[in-house]
From Swiss-Prot:
<dbReference type="GO" id="GO:0000136">
    <property type="term" value="C:mannan polymerase complex"/>
</dbReference>
<dbReference type="GO" id="GO:0000009">
    <property type="term" value="F:alpha-1,6-mannosyltransferase activity"/>
</dbReference>
<dbReference type="InterPro" id="IPR029044">
    <property type="entry name" value="Nucleotide-diphossugar_trans"/>
</dbReference>
<keyword id="KW-0808">Transferase</keyword>
<comment type="similarity">
    <text>Belongs to the glycosyltransferase 34 family.</text>
</comment>
<keyword id="KW-0732">Signal</keyword>
<dbReference type="GO" id="GO:0005794">
    <property type="term" value="C:Golgi apparatus"/>
</dbReference>
<protein>
    <recommendedName>
        <fullName>Uncharacterized alpha-1,2-galactosyltransferase C8D2.17</fullName>
        <ecNumber>2.4.1.-</ecNumber>
    </recommendedName>
</protein>
<dbReference type="GO" id="GO:0000139">
    <property type="term" value="C:Golgi membrane"/>
</dbReference>
<dbReference type="Pfam" id="PF05637">
    <property type="entry name" value="Glyco_transf_34"/>
</dbReference>
<dbReference type="GO" id="GO:0006487">
    <property type="term" value="P:protein N-linked glycosylation"/>
</dbReference>
<dbReference type="GO" id="GO:0005783">
    <property type="term" value="C:endoplasmic reticulum"/>
</dbReference>
<dbReference type="InterPro" id="IPR008630">
    <property type="entry name" value="Glyco_trans_34"/>
</dbReference>
<keyword id="KW-0256">Endoplasmic reticulum</keyword>
<feature type="signal peptide">
    <location>
        <begin position="1"/>
        <end position="32"/>
    </location>
</feature>
<keyword id="KW-0328">Glycosyltransferase</keyword>
Length: 328
């Protein structure tokens, strides 16, 4: 005898399975397409004047124009001062100002606490919406350069173009077929890369891919990457290296993203203090990331030490009453 009850149960199960497969297919298709978020404010939504720092004008589609982004966190401020000021951060901004003025770049300062309040993100995850805001605010910039506040530009006379953005320079510095994460040797950069296909330039260290000195080309790929990187599922995944691990996961899971991310030697964009020989700062390196400073006072002492060692050819352009967007 035909078992109608069994047939009914099987039919329901197959129906549910079909729905799940359809939803999965729709989500996969959606996630593979560029996403343009409307959650970011208008170009002037979070802008205010910051006296003494450079704001350069960029021409439409200028491939050499750069917006330098610095995101400051609470540990960059002096907790002993009631006005929440920071001698350390002032020195960092002065260093970045000098570099921006010299090369005609724009400098943007965003406070992590304000980013966190606007978007409900925490810790270093705030660099992602900070980058996304900057893209919206400067649509004509060629590149966005996110550089950690705990860094000193040691060779301010060298432009990013001459350092790494020229195709011949980028080709020279590319790490091809190189592990992105030392614990996942199978995740590697491409064996061949055309500089014209490179939309993200960064480095890796013993903790995997780094976000402390990162360049993102301002094209259609940038919002696609940042929106994928900012997915709530990634933020709730409990990655041990937060946004760094999330970016590594995206490179592992999405060939479209991996195709456009280039690694260069840490010595090119991201030398460290107190690190292994292949990562440690040496005289002549472009910049140095300050390790092992957990508060503004400690960072200031280390900053001063390296700041005095910089290469300082004569600066032709004096600091003036120009402005930079400080996000508040």
């Amino acid at each position: 005898m035909f078992n109608f009850r069994l047939f009914s149960r099987r039919g329901k199960s197959l129906g549910l399975l079909a729905i799940v497969l359809l939803l999965f297919g729709f989500y996969s298709l959606k996630s593979s397409m560029p996403v343009y978020s409307n959650s970011i404010g208008s170009p002037s939504a979070h802008s205010s004047s910051y006296k003494g720092v450079s704001k350069a004008k960029t021409s439409p589609q200028d491939p050499d124009s750069v917006v330098m982004l610095i995101v400051s966190f609470d540990d960059h401020y002096d907790s002993s001062r009631s006005d929440s000021s920071s001698v350390f951060l002032d020195k960092v901004l002065s260093d970045r100002t000098e570099y921006a003025l010299r090369h005609g770049y724009t400098l943007v300062h965003k406070k992590a606490r304000d980013i966190q309040a606007r978007y409900g993100v925490y810790g270093t995850w705030s660099i992602i919406p900070a980058l996304r805001e900057t893209l919206a605010e400067y649509p004509d910039a060629g590149w966005i350069w996110l550089l950690d506040a705990k860094a000193v530009i040691m060779n301010p006379s060298e432009s990013l173009k001459d350092r790494v953005l020229k195709p011949e320079k980028l080709s020279q510095h590319l790490l091809l077929n190189s592990p992105i994460d030392p614990l996942k040797n199978y995740i590697r950069t491409r064996r061949k890369m055309d500089p014209s296909d490179v939309f993200v330039i960064t480095t890796s260290d013993y903790n995997g891919i780094s976000t402390r000195s990162l360049l993102i080309k301002n094209n259609n790929f940038a919002p696609f990457l940042l929106d994928a990187w900012n997915e709530p599922l990634l933020k709730s995944a409990g990655f041990d290296q937060a946004e760094r691990s999330a970016l590594s996961h995206l490179l592992e899971a999405h060939n479209t993203i991996l195709d456009h991310v280039a690694l260069v030697s840490p010595k090119v964009l991201n030398s460290y203090t107190n690190s292994a020989v292949d990562l440690n700062y040496e005289e002549g390196d472009f910049l140095v990331i300050l390790q092992d400073c957990e508060n503004a006072a400690a960072c200031e002492r280390i900053f001063d030490n390296y700041y005095q060692q910089r290469k300082l050819p004569a600066i032709k352009k004096q600091l003036s009453e120009e402005t930079v967007d400080e996000q508040s």
